[in-house]
Amino acid sequence: MSSIVTGASGFIGRMLTRMLVDSGEKVVGIDRVPQPPRPGLTVLTADLLDDDGLVRAALADADAVYHLAGCPGVRDHGDGIAWRRHRDNVLAGARVLNAVPKHVPLLVASSSSVYGGARAGRPSHEADPVRPAGGYAESKVLLERLCAERLERGGRTTVLRPFTVAGEGQRPDMALSLWLAAAREGRPLRVLGSLDRTRDVTDVRQAAQAMIDLAASGAQGVVNVGTGRGQTLRALAAAVAEVLDTEVAFAVEPAPRIEPGASLADTRRLRSLIGWSPRTDLHDVVRRQAAAARPLLEVA
């Protein structure tokens, strides 16, 4: 079986690519960022919006496509961020949606941010109206609309809504990475809003496995990828302190509008499709992420 992973150099993309290759699949990894080659992996270094013949051929000939490429980052910052999000999340997504044959399973990474947070502590269900807050979530809603159009035309399409993925390989600008770096350097951990806010923290390994199982299940439409259990920021900070064997202090700031008070996945549809849902051992996830980041710190 041959699978395509776009965004193969990204956080979830690297883990997904590794797991697919380890399972014996032939994988084509597409990314603008070069990847180290390995047996079972064909690397295509390309921009999805370039008219690259190798990319077109790979997308047309795959048995399954995981479209994870995009412009990440929930918070609005930086010059030109709105255009980059539209370009990388919407326009590039449209290019992939049009290039993959209708009969090929296409799994597209959206985001739990489209929900705008859990409503009164109730888990977010796939049928809930979307309430995007901020440009990132809005770009993902536009991408989801394109996916719905492909599905209506008979194209096999699954929209993935991952919840707060953590573990080895997490981007350095994400919350847990920032907290680990701050704790190592003796700086206070920056907290937006309150330590009592909750997040559905999902282990990157289990998120990737859920995506693989969804591809095999023939699932179509929108599917949450989360645990269905909220973890407080206080519990996450305690895990950081325990893993690094240090005391931590906090710098609490008002939360911006786009920062939800809670995120929580309704996992009933996921479990009905693949028979299980992720379970996160918070200490283990933090330990693995901290261990993976240490060699990078030593090189720097």
What are these regions (language model features)?
Residues 145-199, 204-208, 239-240:
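NAD(P)-dependent short-chain dehydrogenase/reductase
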Residues 48-88:
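NAD(P)H-binding glycine-rich loop region in Rossmannoid oxidoreductase-like domains
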Residues 25-36:
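Conserved glycine-rich Rossmann-like NAD(P)H-binding loop of the short-chain dehydrogenase/reductase
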Residues 3-22:
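N-terminal Rossmann NAD(P)H-binding glycine-rich loop of SDR-like oxidoreductase domains
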Residues 183, 187-300:
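C-terminal substrate-binding subdomain of Rossmann-fold SDR/epimerase-dehydratase oxidoreductases
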Residues 139:
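Active-site helix of classical SDR
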Residues 94-135:
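Conserved Rossmann-fold NAD(P)-dependent oxidoreductase catalytic core, especially the SDR/UDP-sugar
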Residues 6, 30, 65-69, 106-112, ...:
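SDR active-site strand-loop-helix element
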